[in-house]
């Protein structure tokens, strides 16, 4: 189930719902294969929020901004001779009772080291991601995405975690489940 770009903590239960789908999404992004990534989503307005400097929250709320951020930040680092991978440290997935909606929460750490194997502390960060999935054409497709980045960008930075997950979940329940 692991790939070149995605590693699982030994504590992860590999039979958790949607783990395979989450790994596919991560793997396609880590490989910069955005067409493959887009084939597994029905979400052009995913949100990433993080607070790396001076309390200012940056929000990316569309796929193009997100791809630009990822390409600029991670792709440039891997092109400069660093080995890049994501470790999934914690995972939880659940399906709705009628099996039409599911969500997963992933806590991961991005790692970068020199390709020679020297541990080079350039960019590690923790990221909590919540994906909401629904069934489309008999397979799970990512429907809504939210990530909050926290952690260490190679220099001591204080992050303020401002998650919008409860708000997103409330909207989803109203729109998708009619509650």
Segment roles from a protein language model:
Residues 34-101, 105:
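A solvent-exposed, acidic/Ser-Thr-rich amphipathic alpha-helical stretch
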Residues 170-179:
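Low-complexity, charge- and small-residue-enriched intrinsically disordered regions
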Residues 112-117, 152-154:
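A short, acidic/glycine-rich surface segment
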Residues 81, 118-122:
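Short consensus segments that form the blades of beta-propeller domains
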Residues 22, 85-93, 113-114, 126:
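Short structured motifs
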Residues 1-53, 178:
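Short, low-complexity N-terminal intrinsically disordered segments enriched in polar/charged residues
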Residues 105-113:
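Generic short beta-strand segments
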Residues 1-2, 103, 123-166, 171:
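Short beta-strand edge/turn micro-motifs at domain boundaries
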């Amino acid at each position: 189930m692991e790939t070149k770009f995605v590693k699982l903590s030994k504590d992860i239960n590999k039979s958790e719902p949607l783990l395979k789908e989450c790994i596919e999404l991560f793997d396609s992004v880590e490989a910069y294969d955005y067409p493959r990534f887009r084939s597994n989503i029905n979400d052009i307005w995913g949100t990433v929020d993080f607070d790396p400097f001076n309390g200012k929250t940056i929000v990316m709320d569309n796929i193009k901004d997100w791809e630009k951020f990822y390409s600029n930040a991670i792709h440039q680092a891997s092109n400069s001779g660093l080995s890049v991978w994501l470790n999934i440290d914690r995972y939880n997935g659940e399906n709705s009772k009628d099996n039409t909606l599911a969500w997963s929460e992933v806590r991961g750490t991005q790692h970068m080291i020199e390709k020679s194997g020297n541990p080079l502390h350039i960019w590690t960060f923790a990221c909590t991601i919540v994906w909401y999935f629904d069934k489309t054409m008999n397979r799970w497709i990512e429907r809504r995405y939210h990530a909050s980045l926290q952690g260490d960008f190679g220099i001591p930075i204080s992050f303020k975690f401002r998650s919008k997950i409860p708000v997103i979940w409330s909207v989803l329940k109203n729109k998708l489940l009619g509650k």
